[in-house]
Amino acid sequence: MQLFHLCLIISCSCPTVQASKLCLGWLWGMDIDPYKEFGASVEVLSFLPSDFFPSNRDLLDTASALDREALESPEHCSPHHTALRQAILCWGELMNLATWVGSNLEDPASRELVVSYVNVNMGLKIRQLLWFHISCLTFGRETVLEYLVSFGVWIRTPPAYRPPNAPILSTLPETTVVRRRGRSPRRRTPSPRRRRSQSPRRRRSQSRESQC
């Protein structure tokens, strides 16, 4: 989809991103959200500011360090690994396209427009995807979803009524007060008392009689 946006920008005489999106909606008429099957949404991810996400290079290094074996495996490991593979391949193709445009597009203004669009707009979307799936594999999907809700509540609360610092994902499981639905705290049933063969008093009386 994003590659088609770029093709429209390059080929149109009056290129606009809005026009390419309208054209795509007319062609397909689909509203695809890459986070929907994981319980999140593009809107929820948009609560996090753009400078929150590490660079693509750092995220790719993290994915390689933590999940390289699973990402290179021919077997299906998890939906998050599959999504990571697709995002990594997509970013690689975008870099190839940006390099090709920079080398072959004669108009400097158009060349700068395309390269900037790839690095800024599409780069942010790839950073969001990489961060989400790496975090789900590291901390667990439920923890990441709780974090997104907590951050969304924090960022939309007026500064005078919220804590000075935003929630931190790595410490969320220790500080969260939200209880999971459908689970009640377990009550320990009292264990049956064991019968004592002889009470302490009886033992003492027997010992005294033996001494006499």
From Swiss-Prot:
It comes from the Viruses. Residues 184-212 form a propeptide. Residues 165-212 are annotated as: Disordered. Transmembrane segments: none annotated. GO terms for molecular function: DNA binding; RNA binding; structural molecule activity. The record marks 183-184 as: Cleavage. Residues 1-19 form the signal peptide. Residues 184-206 are annotated as: 3 X 8 AA repeats of S-P-R-R-R-R-S-Q. It is found in: Secreted; Host nucleus. One of its GO terms (cellular component) is extracellular region. GO terms for biological process: microtubule-dependent intracellular transport of viral material towards nucleus; symbiont entry into host cell; viral penetration into host nucleus. Coiled coil: none annotated. Residues 178-205 have a biased composition (Basic residues). Sequence repeats lie at residues 184-190, 191-198, 199-206. Residues 25-27 are annotated as: HBEAG. Phosphorylated. Cleaved by host furin. Keywords: Disulfide bond, Host nucleus, Host-virus interaction, Repeat, Secreted, Signal, Viral immunoevasion. HAMAP family: HBV_HBEAG. May regulate immune response to the intracellular capsid in acting as a T-cell tolerogen, by having an immunoregulatory effect which prevents destruction of infected cells by cytotoxic T-cells. This immune regulation may predispose to chronicity during perinatal infections and prevent severe liver injury during adult infections. Homodimerizes. Belongs to the orthohepadnavirus precore antigen family. This is External core antigen. The gene is C.
